[in-house]
Structure formats: structure tokens, C-alpha cells
Amino acid sequence: MLDLLKISVTGDPSSGKTEACQVFEDLGAYVISADKVSHSFLVPYTSVGQRIIDLLGPEIIIENTLSRKAIAEKVFGNRDLLLSLEEILHPEVCRFVEEKYAHVVQEQKYPLFIAEFPLLYEIQYADWFDQVILISADTGIRKERFLKKTGGSDTSFDLRCARFSSLEEKILRADVVIENNGTKEEFRRKVKQCFKALKGTI
């Protein structure tokens, strides 16, 4: 039996990664989100949580959890703190994803294993995957989506984007690039076509 194909979906903020992963999941793929995994570590009573508290201070604890809003306020705009936080979280996230993959392979229920990894190239993790799908969208469109979804500011969008490497570089490295500058229906159709093509390689 061939190993289950490992595919990462990546892209800049508000490019459409989560929407693409939802389509893949609807079509039967196993989907895991690196962001959701990292959020699961944001509790004060774990070793990871304690390391984050030591880094950022006890004021990030709100209602017995580590506040993502408080963390974001501290690290976005402070590159050193952000990188230190990532050094704590990313190895744990990658370990969790790899363990989950091993379990999913044993289940033999899914045609594809999809992992949404926003900072895939930035943390040098692309080589673990068999293929990388990059979701691409123009900056202005992404900013509009971000502001509409989060109610945040232009500055908060720019700070989040600052951590990401250049889109041009990622386009050259990705196995598949799906553009998302049009309607949701157009984008979902492209993702479905991609799913069919990927299944054909199994």
C-alpha cells in the first residue's frame, strides 16, 4: 500500500487557505490546521503554555486560557518576541501533525492528507510534504477580506503580512498555485479541479 499523500496548503494572510481546505474536506480529504493546533497549546497548565507565559508574561492569561488577542498585541510589531514564540510553538505543531498523519494512514479512510500551514516556507517545513499548494491573491483583495472578516486595521494587516516571505519566491517553489482573485464560486471550482488532479496521482 502506498503511503497517504501529504499535501500542504499555504499562502499569505486572507488568501483563501481555509476556504480551500474546507473544499478539500467536503470532498473527503483529511484536513488539519496548523493554526488550530497551535491554539490548542494556548493553555496555562501545559509545559508549552508555561514557556509562553515565561516569554510574554502572566498578563496574557485571561479566563484560564492564554489570550490570543493579548499575545498578538505583544508579538506583532516585535519581531524578536514573535520569533521566540514561534520557536516554542512550531516544533510542537509539526510534531503533532506528523503524529496525526501516522494515525490517519492507519485508518485507511481518506484519499488525501491536507495540512493548512500559513508559514510553511518560513519555518522550513515544506520538504516534509509530498506536494505544496499555494493560494495566491492580490494584496489589495487580501486586505479587503481581512478588514471585513476581522474588523482590524490596515496596520494589523500589514504587521501580520510582515512575517511572510515574498509571494514571488513561494510561487517558484510551490507545486501548485491556485489564484483567488475572483468570486468564491470560481475559487471553489479551481480547488475541486485540483482535488481531482491530486487523486489521479495516487
UniProtKB/Swiss-Prot annotation:
Q: Name one GO molecular function term.
A: ATP binding
- Keyword Kinase found: yes
Spell out the SUPFAM superfamilies in the cross-references. P-loop containing nucleoside triphosphate hydrolases
GO biological process: one example:
coenzyme A biosynthetic process
List each copy of the DPCK domain by range.
6-202
**Localization annotation:** Cytoplasm
**Which catalytic reaction applies to this protein?**
3'-dephospho-CoA + ATP = ADP + CoA + H(+)
A Gene Ontology cellular-component term: cytoplasm
| Enzyme Commission code | 2.7.1.24
Q: Which HAMAP family match?
A: Dephospho_CoA_kinase (MF_00376)
Q: Please give the name of this protein.
A: Dephospho-CoA kinase
Q: What is the organism of origin for this protein? A: Chlamydia trachomatis serovar D (strain ATCC VR-885 / DSM 19411 / UW-3/Cx)
Q: Which gene encodes it?
A: coaE
